[in-house]
Amino acid sequence: MAVAVRTLQEQLEKAKESLKNVDENIRKLTGRDPNDVRPIQARLLALSGPGGGRGRGSLLLRRGFSDSGGGPPAKQRDLEGAVSRLGGERRTRRESRQESDPEDDDVKKPALQSSVVATSKERSTERPLFQDQNTDEKETPERPGPIFGLLMGTLQKFKQESTVATERQKRRQEIEQKLEVQAEEERKQVENERRELFEERRAKQTELRLLEQKVELAQLQEEWNEHNAKIIKYIRTKTKPHLFYIPGRMCPAPKLIEESQRKTNALFEGRRIEFAEQINKMEARPRRQSMKEKEHQVVVRNEEQKSEQEEGKVAPRTRVMLRALDDLVARVGTPSPRRGSGEEEEKEIPIVHSDAEKEQEEEEQKQEMEVKMEEETEVRESEKQQDSQPEEVMDVLEMVESVKNVIAEQEVMETNQVERVEPSENEASKELEPEMEFEIEPDKECKSLSPGKENASTLEMENEPEEKEEKESEPQPEPMAQPQAQSLPQPQPQRHRQSQSQPQQYSSPPPLSQPETLPLAVSQPPPQLIQRQGHLPPERKEFLVESVKLTEVPTEPVLTVHSESKYETKTRSRSRGRARNRTSKSRSRSSSSSSSSSSSTSSSSGSSSSSGSSSSRTSSSSSSTSGSSSRDSSSSTTSSSESRSRSRGRGHNRDRKHRRSVDRKRRDASGLERSHKSAKGGSSRDAKAVSSSGMPRFKPGQL
């Protein structure tokens, strides 16, 4: 504490010295000491009087003093001397003016040109006018010459004096103006210096007063510390007023002493802190504005750093979410539904009119899936580049939720399908066995079939789309009847899988890879699950054929298709418009391919039963007919009854055959190449399935 007092005293001495220097500068500039106080009488004289201060009142007072002779004798002498001096100066000025008046008048007065004017003489009326004129003429030559010269000389002299006077006056005015400007500048400079000095003096005085207060406070604090240092050895009572005492014997008293010392030390420390804060506040008054600006800058920097840290944390979080989403997609085997997940989940199921059209639609769906996969990979790459943006976190969370929903829906559909497949076997044995005949279109070498059979088969295949359209026009069932309808067997897609076992024996299969006719009775899942299976991995796409029974090949091909209007759900009714557009585009292709396949079906079936053209077909048919002979009669009766109903509309389709024959020829070539690929891919899988289980197992990927 003593050190603080010394430093404050040193600062106080320095401030006093600087104040003295400022006072000396003011004394030099103004001629008086700023610390001196003016006499009270001078102030009273200046303030009293009729004029009320300066001006005429002061002059009247001075006159009264000089006239009355009042006041102190020293003042009287000064006033008399001043008056005499002023009076003497005035007299000398007047005398000098009187002496120099003529000259000054010549200089100051404007020069006038003198002119001699002849006075008119009084003419007597007695003499005539012409006599007077004659006398004038006589007198003019007698005029003396020196008078005219004197006049001219005076005039010229006046003119010269006037010009000289004007030049002198101009020079004098210029000099006076320069002097006035210089005097004004000096006066302003003196005023500025004086103002600056007085401002500096005020600042020094305030600093001096502040230092004096600090020194005084420091001295008081030091005295207080000395006093408390003496008291600290004693015990302070808890009650007020506090008393300090010390016991004669120290029993438990040392504890009390320590506690008292601790409290007093805390009190001292608090007092020291308050003292330091007070001094800092006194020093920080001029710097308050600058400190506020610095604090504001620090706050702004901290906010910027926090925002940068938050942005840096968000980017890794988005990367982690994207990785988790990719893992889920890899487990399920479906493409990640980035951005367009809602569209893929809400994909509507098209209406299947015939097996040929269904195969064509499945191929189109595969192409669409490939295009979507490519688009989603591009979206993935673009989103990986934008991982640093915090907005992607919400998108990723939504995507993960959508993927989980899709997985849950698929699992529910699978469990429902397993439950529906078992009762469908019993129902299939009781109901009519649908028969569906497909055959690969023969090569150019195998085109020696009868035209009558071809026409009949084409008419049967063309009747199929019309029957489907008639069934679609029927009213949709209520939503409550959907679970019952979905439990019924649907043989069409499974027949596709069954028909894939024999396409390898031909060199030129049709565009849709339709194999030889095999009437099947298969428990088929509902079309919703078939549409879902397009997104599932191959392990979940397999369906076991529950009962496959081959019948004898009939002489006339029969085509039976169950109406699927009972199995349509609300989503399928919404998609009817889209399905019609899609089927109308592919109707020409499917009808031509179906007609050609049906014609080839009848010929190949006849040839297989009579001549045994294909050893593989005959072997498979002979092995399968032994197990299915019990149901031949029922299937033949049902097929004949259904063929009768279809034969009614054959007359309407004859006109279509001529129009579609041209399209069929064009698409034969493109369909051959496609069927080669599908036949090669499906043959190896079918052979494994037949050899392992005895019954063929088919996958939707072969369609």
UniProtKB/Swiss-Prot annotation:
| InterPro entries the record matches | Pinin (IPR039853), Pinin_SDK_MemA (IPR006786), Pinin_SDK_N (IPR006787)
Residues modified to N6-acetyllysine? 240
Annotated stretches, region: Disordered:
46-148, 284-314, 331-394, 408-703
Task: Offer one Pfam family short name for this entry.
Answer: Pinin_SDK_N
Where is the crosslink of kind Glycyl lysine isopeptide (Lys-Gly) (interchain with G-Cter in SUMO2)?
Answer: 109, 121, 138, 157, 159, 230, 281, 306, 313, 366, 372, 541, 549, 566
Q: Which domain of life is it from?
A: Eukaryota
Report the main location listed first in the record. Answer: nucleus
What is the protein name stated in its UniProt record?
Pinin
Look up and give the organism this protein is from. Answer: Bos taurus
